[in-house]
Amino acid sequence: MPTFDQALRKAGEFGRFQRRVFLLLCLTGVTFAFLFVGVVFLGSQPDYYWCRGPRATALAERCAWSPEEEWNLTTPELHVPAERRGQGHCHRYLLEDTNTSSELSCDPLAAFPNRSAPLVPCSGDWRYVETHSTIVSQFDLVCGNAWMLDLTQAILNLGFLAGAFTLGYAADRYGRLIVYLISCFGVGITGVVVAFAPNFSVFVIFRFLQGVFGKGAWMTCFVIVTEIVGSKQRRIVGIVIQMFFTLGIIILPGIAYFTPSWQGIQLAISLPSFLFLLYYWVVPESPRWLITRKQGEKALQILRRVAKCNGKHLSSNYSEITVTDEEVSNPSCLDLVRTPQMRKCTLILMFAWFTSAVVYQGLVMRLGLIGGNLYMDFFISGLVELPGALLILLTIERLGRRLPFAASNIVAGVSCLVTAFLPEGIPWLRTTVATLGRLGITMAFEIVYLVNSELYPTTLRNFGVSLCSGLCDFGGIIAPFLLFRLAAIWLELPLIIFGILASVCGGLVMLLPETKGIALPETVEDVEKLGSSQLHQCGRKKKTQVSTSNV
């Protein structure tokens, strides 16, 4: 009985049918990027903020103060460098105790010796000066509530983590396409609710749900794309689909610039997902999944459609097709750590996923804290990511996996450390070094997808990659707290943490086995032999392309 891969070769492994489906599903990567990094614009800090007391409110109305005058006359001098974004006060002058005669004056500080009034903490009635409204001004996420901005991104990543396990399981049980469509619908609906959330609690709850559905849509589209093409094309399509994620990062600042409110940005992030529901009529269910669920006839119908569109013919000999037993096995968590080599690979890969997420998200969100043109800086940082995919394609088949993987992490780590200590008087050098760091961590993020799938045997590949990549979402939960809370102490402190993490990761990945030119391991025993020189010598004669289909 022929296997699915044999039938796919007859129908065409990457013909017109697959290219059309591939292009359509790649657009999901664009919208997922909007969701993944949208907090930079949704939660951008206002230019200035302060709070009003009862007396200041009356004076502002009677004296017709401008916002700048109110800022200067009712709040203490702020000793913050002018180039820092988001200047604000967490205290105000206590003006309520002034005498009656001073109430007639439009200079409330004149009643105090040395024009120095007592200070009290702000308790509400916040005022903002900003060019675009954000969730910070909508929900007063400043001063004592500043940590709640960190929470919004952490909750989104918690949704990603929940979606990876719940919808990942659902996609294996009920089908890739149905879960993809439900996820796209969920992203749209929850996104609209987020845009019109009446309070912060509703905002956070539905942002979590949008994260669940967003991860489900991204994960299942990735799987459908890689399961419908031949094994030789999986490595390339796995990298190219991530380039569409980068395309989303490049497009997002343009949307944010021309959209005056955070609600508009949120709708722009969410509404395109409804268009993906039209894929019901053009994107098929994964035939490979259908076979594992003993629906071979439906899989054959799809393969005949593929063959017809590709200008090929699937002969009557392919009346039944099957998959290998490994593709329907039931793995266990213990299998990932039971043996020495598997244990080493699992722990290092988990750390690599965690580091990639923390450093990547940290560098992206940091753009919202530093000075300069946020929109242009974000756009340029997205452009920087594009060469990363090209460098990966050029190096991994020549230099192997370990060296580019380690080098990209070390470049990212060293760049972060150097940027932290460069003087601000040479911005061009800081920008250049920071750009190298962004390029390095982007490459590391993309390579870990590939290496993870190569190092696990067929019996554990789906489960193992899903479990390890869960550390990516956990890193995303940690990243905003790590960035914003440490930046409040010293703006460059997060860069030092990022630099240490990435540098350590670069050293650890050199301990992984090299898999260039090595056949994909089929069993745990194959993985245990990867470190032996005998297998490496055999591997030079036997080359197999790598599947990244289940990230």
UniProtKB/Swiss-Prot annotation:
Bilayer-crossing regions: 21-41, 177-197, 236-256, 264-284, 376-396, 463-483, 493-513
Intracellular or extracellular location(s): Cell membrane; Apical cell membrane; Basolateral cell membrane; Mitochondrion membrane
Annotated catalysed reactions: (R)-noradrenaline(out) = (R)-noradrenaline(in); (R)-adrenaline(out) = (R)-adrenaline(in); serotonin(out) = serotonin(in); dopamine(out) = dopamine(in)
Keywords: Cell membrane, Glycoprotein, Ion transport, Membrane, Mitochondrion, Nucleus, Transmembrane, Transmembrane helix, Transport
GO cellular-component term (any): plasma membrane
Protein topology in the membrane: Multi-pass membrane protein
pH profile of the protein: Optimum pH is 8.5 for MPP(+) uptake. Optimum pH is 8.5 for TEA uptake.
Lineage top rank: taxon: Eukaryota
Tissue: Highly expressed in placenta. Expressed in intestine, hear, kidney and lung. Widely expressed in brain, particularly in hippocampus, cerebellum, cerebral cortex. In the brain, expressed predominantly in regions located at the brain-cerebrospinal fluid border, with expression extending to regions that belong to monoaminergic pathways such as raphe nuclei, striatum and thalamus. In brain, expressed in neurons and glial cells of amygdala. Expression is low in kidney and lung and undetectable in liver. Expressed in Sertoli cells in testis.
A Gene Ontology BP annotation from the UniProt entry: epinephrine transport
InterPro entries named among the record's database cross-references: MFS_dom, MFS_sugar_transport-like, MFS_trans_sf, Orgcat_transp/SVOP, Sugar_transporter_CS
Positions glycosylated per UniProt: 72, 99, 114, 199, 317
Span of the annotated motif Proline-rich sequence: 284-288
GO molecular-function terms, A-Z: dopamine:sodium symporter activity; monoamine transmembrane transporter activity; neurotransmitter transmembrane transporter activity; organic anion transmembrane transporter activity; organic cation transmembrane transporter activity; quaternary ammonium group transmembrane transporter activity; spermidine transmembrane transporter activity; toxin transmembrane transporter activity
Comment, domains: Contains one proline-rich sequence (Pro-Glu-Ser-Pro-Arg) that is required for transport activity.
Family: Belongs to the major facilitator (TC 2.A.1) superfamily. Organic cation transporter (TC 2.A.1.19) family.
Further remark: Mediates the uptake of clinically used drugs including neurotoxin 1-methyl-4-phenylpyridinium (MPP(+)) and platinum-based drug oxaliplatin. Plays a role in the anticancer activity of oxaliplatin and may contribute to antitumor specificity.
Function: Electrogenic voltage-dependent transporter that mediates the transport of a variety of organic cations such as endogenous bioactive amines, cationic drugs and xenobiotics. Cation cellular uptake or release is driven by the electrochemical potential, i.e. membrane potential and concentration gradient. Functions as a Na(+)- and Cl(-)-independent, bidirectional uniporter.
Protein name: Solute carrier family 22 member 3
